[in-house]
C-alpha cells in the first residue's frame, strides 16, 4: 500500500543515518518511470520523500534525451528543477580504442587499433553499442588470433539482428512522411528540409508539415539536434538498419 511505498523510499536515509555515512543512489534509464500507471502521482511521491533527505543524494540518468528534459525542465512535472542537469559527453575514440585493444589482449585475442576505431565509427561511440559490437567480434575471433574485417562485418550483422525486434517496434507505427524524413537524414540531409528540392525528393509534403514531423520525431527520441538547425538520427544502429 501507500505507507509501504513511503517506507521503502525512506530506507536509504534511515540506513545512512544509522551508519553515519552519506549514500548515493544511482538509477539508470530513469525516464522509464514515465511509463508507470499514474506516473505523475508516483513522481510527486518520490519528490516529496526525496527532497526531505539530507544524507542521501540521487543520481538519475537516462538515454532518452527528450523525455529526461521534459521531466526535469518542464514546469508541469514534479521533478522540475529537482537538481543539476548534466549532458554527458561520449567517451573519446582514443580511450575506446585503447580499452577495446586491451580487453582483447587480456583474453589472449588481438584486434588492430584500426579495427577498434571502425567499431567506434560504426557505433558513433554509443557505449552500449560499442560493448555489444566489440563482444560479437570478440566471440568470432579464435584464441590467439587477430580480428579481421570479416569478423567486424559478422559482428555488425549480429548487432543488427539483435536490435531488429526493437527497431521494428520503434518504426512500425510511423507514417510514410515520418519514414521519409528519417531517410532524408540518413542520406545526409541535416538542415534545409523546407527547400523545394528536398521537399520533393523525399516527399515531405509542405513546409508546415516538416515542422510537425520534426516535433513528432523528437518526442519519440528518434532524432536529435546536436547543433543549431542541424538534425541527426538519435540512434546510429537504427540508421544503419534503415539503410
Write out the residue ranges for each language-model feature.
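Conserved RecA-like P-loop NTPase ATPase core
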Residues: 12, 28, 88, 119, ...
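Conserved Walker B catalytic segment
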Residues: 1-64, 73
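C-terminal leucine-rich, beta-strand-based interaction scaffolds used for sensing/assembly
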Residues: 17, 161, 165-243
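Alpha-helical sensor/transducer elements of the RecA-like P-loop NTPase core
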Residues: 57-104
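Short, flexible helix/strand-to-coil boundary loops that buttress conserved ligand/catalytic motifs
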Residues: 37, 46, 71-72, 100, ...
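Amphipathic alpha-helical "lid/sensor" segments that cap RecA-like P-loop NTPase cores
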Residues: 97, 101-165
Amino acid at each position: 500500500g501507500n505507507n509501504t511505498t513511503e517506507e521503502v523510499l525512506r530506507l536509504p536515509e534511515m540506513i545512512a543515518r544509522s551508519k553515519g555515512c552519506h549514500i548515493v543512489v544511482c538509477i539508470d534509464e530513469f525516464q522509464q518511470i514515465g511509463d508507470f500507471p499514474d506516473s505523475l502521482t508516483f513522481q510527486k511521491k518520490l519528490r516529496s520523500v526525496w527532497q526531505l533527505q539530507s544524507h542521501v543524494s540521487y543520481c538519475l540518468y537516462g538515454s532518452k534525451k527528450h523525455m529526461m528534459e521534459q521531466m526535469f525542465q518542464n514546469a508541469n512535472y514534479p521533478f522540475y528543477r529537482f537538481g543539476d542537469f548534466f549532458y554527458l559527453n561520449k567517451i573519446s575514440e582514443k580511450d575506446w580504442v585503447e580499452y577495446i585493444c586491451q580487453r582483447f589482449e587480456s583474453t589472449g585475442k588481438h584486434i588492430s587499433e584500426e579495427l577498434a576505431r571502425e567499431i567506434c565509427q560504426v557505433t558513433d561511440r554509443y557505449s552500449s553499442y560499442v560493448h555489444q559490437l566489440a563482444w560479437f567480434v570478440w566471440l568470432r575471433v579464435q584464441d590467439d588470433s587477430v580480428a579481421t574485417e570479416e569478423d567486424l562485418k559478422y559482428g555488425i550483422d549480429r548487432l543488427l539482428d539483435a536490435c531488429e525486434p526493437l527497431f521494428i517496434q520503434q518504426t512500425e507505427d510511423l507514417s510514410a512522411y515520418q519514414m521519409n524524413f528519417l531517410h532524408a537524414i540518413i542520406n545526409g540531409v541535416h538542415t534545409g528540409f523546407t527547400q523545394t528540392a528536398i521537399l520533393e525528393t523525399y516527399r515531405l509534403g509542405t513546409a508546415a508539415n516538416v515542422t510537425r514531423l520534426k516535433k513528432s520525431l523528437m518526442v519519440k527520441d528518434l532524432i536529435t539536434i546536436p547543433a543549431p538547425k542541424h538534425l541527426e538520427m538519435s540512434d546510429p544502429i537504427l540508421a544503419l538498419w534503415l539503410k
